[in-house]
């Protein structure tokens, strides 16, 4: 389909009077395209779930909650928060595993206009204290692990904490907190530009930034994904007229709810279609396969390695996955061979990926089907009709197609500010554009290719080396499961390249073989000087991206011992 056909479809789907009609609004001094019919606030989104009131909404192990039950639990939370003195704009923290109470707490907090602070449940006690103090929490929901981590700081914090799934002395248990709460949802006014969430960046830096976003930003992001489906149906009516699916929509909650993928893409995107959300205690590919069969999962979204782990599992053939219609993820590039195998094993056209950030509600680009198989290294095109993507040089000037620079994202879904960090906000958010720090280019058709991070560039003897370029080559080796490439200090060259590689234990491979493989595909100076090969998976940060900083620190320590 030529670009003209896409433009015509966007115009038809978004014209005045249509469900996805758009208009221009000035927000914080910037003119944005917004959906005319977007819900006013997240409470109205939750109300949409009542159209499927008796349908199962959330599953955790042997616990099941309908949309009606979730609405009523959220109402109890909201009413009791008001009783505790929480007002619009107050920050309330959630520091839990992906328990049902996480969902109910978030719904209750945001339904009364308070700000839900999604605390990183993987933080240490000291890091938790940083988040609590930085955000200025008035109240905290925490489970046993988080409460124990905070105990050494009890005297310092003096914060009211609601204990979830535990009853430690001196804390109010969840059941007691909500016991007398009305099941009628509060009706407090929550204007669309009210602040809704603070999500902390993944924690790969010493001091994570709190990303503040409004109800409007989140709701427009959700509608943009919906609208993309409507545009596709307009362009390809035969595909849209396909037989009704065998099963109701259902997905797996594969990542923590404190991460934008878990919160927005998986949780909040479930209300409109009445999708079932099945939580796991922790990610495990074999367990996920069992859930896909048992719960009739229809879509799967996580980081790219998760879909790859599914199709590589020795148990893959044992399960009935016929209900699964799509599988993919974002947050990292997918190796071409991984994309092909996912598509072959899960059904033609099912594989896909996308790109987004906490600062953009996870929304920016998307790609799937045949387009993805043709361009597996691309993260797609800007999602219409709200998103724009551009590439700029170091002076901030726009670059033409196929030239490499910093990628920037524009749209109403962008965050409002970094909490308590005005300088970081000013440098990242400029005239409605988020300056991502991702390095890449767009081709002539608008497909985005991320080649590196600004901070992930290694300069070896004056030569710039993009780590993702080297990783992509190593991923093409059939024995390679995961790769991390990074720079380590070198007295002569300034930096040299190092890599830690997880390989398939059933396909042993030597350092010399991998070096030769890379040398056939890369300039010599781009081939890593240091290799560490292992069969254990590489460590991850909360967003499920590989924890490169930790691996680099370990590598530097090992090299210091041997020199």
Summary of predicted features, one role per range:
Residues 66-68, 196-224, 232:
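Conserved AMP-binding A3 loop
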Residues 34-38, 54-99, 103-107, 124-129:
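Conserved AMP-binding/adenylate-forming core of the ANL superfamily
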Residues 219-253, 258-298, 313:
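Conserved AMP-binding/adenylation subdomain of ANL enzymes
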Residues 23, 145-192, 219, 555, ...:
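ANL superfamily adenylate-forming
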Residues 123, 129, 140, 300, ...:
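AMP-binding/adenylate-forming catalytic core of the ANL superfamily
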Residues 381-386, 397-428, 463-465:
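Conserved ATP/PPi-binding loop(s) of AMP-dependent carboxylate-activating enzymes
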Residues 272-273, 294-302, 311-374, 388:
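Gly/Ser/Thr-rich phosphate-binding loop
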